[in-house]
Design a protein with these regions (language model features):
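Non-catalytic cap/lid and distal C-terminal segments of serine-dependent acyl enzymes
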Residues: 12-322
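Sec-dependent N-terminal signal peptides of Gram-positive bacterial secreted proteins and lipoproteins
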Residues: 1-5
């Protein structure tokens, strides 16, 4: 018996043949990003809100929080204007604040979003940053085995607990709160993550493709273990996730935009698994005119949020075209 494990929308999706050069379906280079300009606050700034919801896992009921980026110009009373939602998961040992309001000296994702939206390079969206841990203090995940289990199981919490709360509180495309309503609105939803958040992303694709159409794994490959706990190679990982997707009616209706760096600890493993997906996983179309798998690497890119937010600066205008 094997199970997958990985390292740590949208109203309209960009057609594969129209993607920008830096994310063509081969190992493309990522151009430089004007980080100094982006790090300055935009004139039109979105807001950061904290959302509380009730989550369930393994028989436990708990209160959890997520940070929500609400774009400039959002009007709660204007029900005619609806927004796509990006769910973005942090890396191991981090929390709900790591993307949008990081306590470090690199530019925050909120500034990236503000500038892209203000400049008209992407349409306004909601961005939700939850945690796979029980809370922001990493309670319940003192061991790596516990943390990886949480990432593997998060797809259930996303569909049953988080999406219904987020997407009924804000003006989105969700109509109802049951699983059918979530599935019907999947085209307006994306999921991404960094490091162990990429682990969560690959798991979401494998187990919950019915709820989300577009995926953004950032510096994280797919891990598969055998019954003895031995990590399998990239080919086995690719075949595993392909087999999981074959069980879904949405096996031919998803897109993956992957990014990493040449100096990232997850760089070569992620490159290997992407190439294996293209070779051994028929549901993943890579290096083809109708590609649904895209991958790019940043020269000297390392395993930290500063570079991850650069990848998002480049990816989001493709996925959330204005």
């Amino acid at each position: 018996m094997m199970f997958g494990m990985s390292a740590s929308l949208m109203a309209q999706t960009a057609e594969p043949q129209h993607v920008s050069p830096f994310v063509e379906s081969h190992v493309a280079s990522i151009p430089s990003v004007p980080t100094q300009d982006i790090s300055r606050p935009a004139r039109q700034q979105g807001s950061i809100e904290t959302l509380t919801y009730t989550a369930h896992r393994r028989g436990k009921t708990m209160t959890k929080r997520a940070q929500v980026y609400v774009p400039y110009g959002y009007k709660a009373k204007d029900k005619k204007v609806k927004y796509d939602v990006l769910y973005l998961m942090h890396g191991g040992g981090d929390n709900t604040t790591s993307f949008l309001t990081p306590p470090r000296n690199w530019f925050a994702l909120r500034d990236v979003l503000d500038h892209l939206i203000e400049e008209g390079r992407m349409r306004p969206i909601l961005v939700v940053c939850p945690t796979f841990y029980d809370d922001d203090q990493n309670i319940g995940a003192n061991r790596m085995e516990d943390a990886t289990a949480m990432t593997r199981e998060f797809h259930t919490e996303l569909q049953n607990d988080l999406i219904p709360v987020v997407e009924t509180k804000y003006n989105t495309y969700l109509k109802g709160t049951d699983s059918l309503a979530v599935t019907r609105s999947r085209d307006h939803r994306a999921f991404g993550g960094f490091s162990m958040g990429a682990l969560t992303t690959w798991y979401q694709l494998a187990y919950g493709v019915n709820a989300v159409r577009t995926y953004i794994p950032l510096s994280g490959d797919i891990w598969v273990y055998d019954a003895q706990g031995k990590k399998q190679d990239a080919r086995t990982s690719a075949e595993w996730i392909n087999g999981m997707l074959e069980k879904s009616p949405f096996a031919h209706d998803f897109q993956v935009y992957g990014y990493t760096g040449t100096k990232d600890i997850a760089g070569n493993p992620m490159k290997a698994v992407v190439e294996a997906l293209g070779q051994y996983a028929p549901l993943f179309r890579y290096r083809t005119p109708d590609a649904n798998l895209y991958f790019a690497m940043r020269e000297n890119g390392e395993h930290f949020y500063g570079h991850i937010n650069e990848y998002l600066y480049l990816a989001l205008p493709i996925i959330f075209k204005p």
